[in-house]
Every structure is written in structure tokens, then in C-alpha cells.
Amino acid sequence: MSCQPFTSADTFLPLNSEASAALPLIMHPGAAECLPGSNHATNVVSTATGLHYSVPSCHYGNQPSTYGVMAGGLTPCLYKFPEHGLGPGFPAAHQPLLAEGPAVADFKQELRRRSKLAEEPVDTESPEIRELEKFANEFKVRRIKLGYTQTNVGEALAAVHGSEFSQTTICRFENLQLSFKNACKLKAILSKWLEEAEQVGALYNEKVGANERKRKRRTTISIAAKDALERHFGEQNKPSSQEIMRMAEELNLEKEVVRVWFCNRRQREKRVKTSLNQSLFTISKEHLECR
């Protein structure tokens, strides 16, 4: 509260020792607040003649108003502050008056309107939603194909963008459990990560292909085909290239598969014969020793 100038109606008469008992000191109602040395205790103002008048302590000079007190009246506050007394001359304002003013009512109405807008569901048939769903599915497939887990992706993103990324975040994105706004933000980050991961994977595959021979998939031969090959092996254990091609066409197998089968079959027979010869030699030796 600011000090106000005296009006023209306020006058002071000089005081002397004779008139001091009859004339009171005329003061403006707000003048006590402007006196120097005010504090929370009762101050005493001494005149030149020794008169003493009690002046109420000032509570406004060094304390901010906690109820939004402005010049010309009370303005409601939007925030809650600690409760303090307003001091002499100003009764405490009633709380409903401060909380339900026009400004606060408009503010609450605006909050309710924004909350209602935030709760409105996003159109699930919009192109943006469909594009997001498509990317989430493609991301999961490509991530698995590259050999990365959700934990791998979360740790990689957390190292660059912060700890808010984790395995749970990636899982919720792939299952479309994030809000539309957060999913759109994460989509841009995952797109960049996926692009770099595929580049690294391509370089690794090129390096492996140059240094190592790619192993062919193991071929499974049916029982009927094995029986036919066994019959051919009994007739000719070393077939020519033309015979191998003919057998491959009859059995619906690749020529290389038939050729390898005959090679393996000859090696197996050789091992069996070697083992049999060793057994016969051992038996003969033992028989001679017994004599």
C-alpha cells in the first residue's frame, strides 16, 4: 500500500507547552505506515514537546501481499501461497472471493476445455495412423532380421538420446501402445537407427562373404531315394558323370547331391572294410598265439 498525500482539509496547528493538553495531533489514516522505523512492535512518535502517541505497527512495508492486493481493490491470485494476515485496517479476504473471481473462473473453464480436447481419441482411420502402424510392423520385422533385440535398440538409443529410452519403450511402440504424439517423435528416431543398423549389417555381410565360404543348406534325401541310390551303388559304386545326371533326374535331386552321396557312401564302405580287416587280423593273431 502506497502513501497518499494529505488532502487540503487536513491542517496542523503549532504546538506549545500550553496548548499541548487541549489540541490532539491530527494525522492522515495512512500516515502511520510511512513513518520511519516501523516494525511489528508498537512504535511511539515523540513530538518536540514530549507528547507521545501510540501508532499501530505497519505490516506492509517489507512483506509482499499473499492475496494479490493491488491498488484500488483485491485481484484474485491463480496460485496458492502461504497464509498471512493482512494487518490492521484490512480484514482478511474471504477465500471464496479470491478463488472464484472472473479470471479464475475463465481459467478453470479453459483448463476443462483443453482437458476435453486432450481426451478426444485420434481418428484411427487417418492416413497418419495407418502409416504409423505400417512402420511399426516393418520396424519389428527388419529389427528381428538384423538380429537385434528390443533391449539392444533401447540401449543404443539411451546412449545417444537419454535414459528415457528402454526395452519397454520399444515394446510399447511396436505394439502401438504409445500416444500418437510420442509415437511420431519416436518414429523419426527409430527410422534413423534402422537406416544405420542396415548399413552396418550390409558391411558385415560383405566382410563375411569375402573371408568365409558360405555353407550350403543341408539336403534331406527321402527313404525311397536312398533305396534307389543303394541299388545303383551295388551295381556300380563309381558311376560316370552321365549316370549321375540320369539318376539325379530320375530321383528329382540335384546332380551335386547325387555325386556327394556316392562319395560319402564309398568312404563309409572303406571304413567298414578297414574295420573288418582289422578285426579279422586280430582274431587270426590270437588264434596263432593260442597254439
UniProtKB/Swiss-Prot annotation:
InterPro entries, per the entry: HD, Homeobox_CS, Homeodomain-like_sf, Lambda_DNA-bd_dom_sf, POU, POU_dom, POU_domain_TF
SUPFAM superfamilies in the record: Homeodomain-like (SSF46689), lambda repressor-like DNA-binding domains (SSF47413)
DNA-binding region: 214-273
Pfam families: Homeodomain (PF00046), Pou (PF00157)
Gene3D superfamilies xrefs: Homeodomain-like, lambda repressor-like DNA-binding domains
Localization in the cell: Nucleus
Location (main, coarse): nucleus
UniProt record, GO biological process: positive regulation of transcription by RNA polymerase II; regulation of transcription by RNA polymerase II
Annotated signal sequence range: none
POU-specific domain: residues covered: 124-198
GO molecular function (one): RNA polymerase II-specific DNA-binding transcription factor binding
GO cellular component, one term: cytosol
Chain ranges for the short sequence motif 9aaTAD as given in the UniProt record: 5-13
Keywords: Activator, DNA-binding, Homeobox, Nucleus, Transcription, Transcription regulation
Purpose of the protein: Transcription factor involved in the specification of the lactotrope, somatotrope, and thyrotrope phenotypes in the developing anterior pituitary. Activates growth hormone and prolactin genes. Specifically binds to the consensus sequence 5'-TAAAT-3'.
Sequence similarity: Belongs to the POU transcription factor family. Class-1 subfamily.
Domain comment quoted from the record: The 9aaTAD motif is a transactivation domain present in a large number of yeast and animal transcription factors.
Subunit organization: Interacts with PITX1. Interacts with LHX3. Interacts with ELK1.
Protein name: Pituitary-specific positive transcription factor 1
Originating organism: Canis lupus familiaris (Dog)
